[in-house]
Amino acid sequence: MKVLIVFAHHEPRSYNALLRDRAEAVLASAGHEVRLSDLYAMGFDPVAGPRDVGAAAGEGPVNLLLAQRDAAARGTFSEDIRREMEKVAWADFLLVVCPVWWFSVPAILKGWFDRVLAAGFAYDFGRIYDKGLLRGKRGMLCVTTGGPEALYHRDAPHGATLDQILWPVTDGTLHFCGLDVLPTFVAWSVFQAGDAGRAEYLVQLEQRLRALEQTAPLPGHGFTK
């Protein structure tokens, strides 16, 4: 299997980096091909705009969705986007490793979604969910939280489960583009987990990754037009 790891954390010595490294090692040892997009290390620009699609200044208002579709047809995406699109097209499996910030993912990762999972490449009019342009691929989030699992329930302070909080990413982004999305791996409350707890999360991640082929995706839904 060909796996693309998309990593979004500014600190190369972070626990997220340990999760990334363990994932890369486990997947490689299982015979999978692994590529990495380390967004901070790459200096990836998260700001989407006309320059992404070869639109010149002064040409008038740019509808980015339509411009992306045109760039996909003409092959005029900027070089940094083309490189990432090539990785996505190559991959069978997309593993996203990041912390949960502000009930979502880091801005640099959101920008990667905005720029790389572009119209005409990852989805199109009438080509979403089970008809998405990336159908046949699978994906999974691997995230860390600052707070414990007990905070993430309807009757708890956050008022929602983490699955509900991350729904815009798992369903509204990855599944929207056609991916079958596996259940999210969560390392809860990494600040308070202690060395033993953090070590156990690494073991649990390894077990999850070694069972990828046997893991059923989250319930999805189709698109009817």
Task: For each feature predicted by the language model, list its residue ranges.
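N-terminal beta1-alpha1-beta2 submodule of the flavodoxin-like/Rossmannoid cofactor-binding fold
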Residues: 1-121, 203-225
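Residues at the starts of beta-strands that form the adenosine-phosphate
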Residues: 2, 33, 138-139, 180-181
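Short, solvent-exposed loop/turn segments at secondary-structure junctions
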Residues: 104-105, 149-152
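Glycine-rich phosphate/pyrophosphate-binding loop and the adjoining helix
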Residues: 152-225
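A gly/proline- and charged-residue-enriched helix-loop-helix capping module
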Residues: 124-128
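Short, well-ordered beta-strand core segments
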Residues: 94, 139-140
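Short, conserved loop/helix-junction motifs that constitute active-site signature segments
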Residues: 131-136
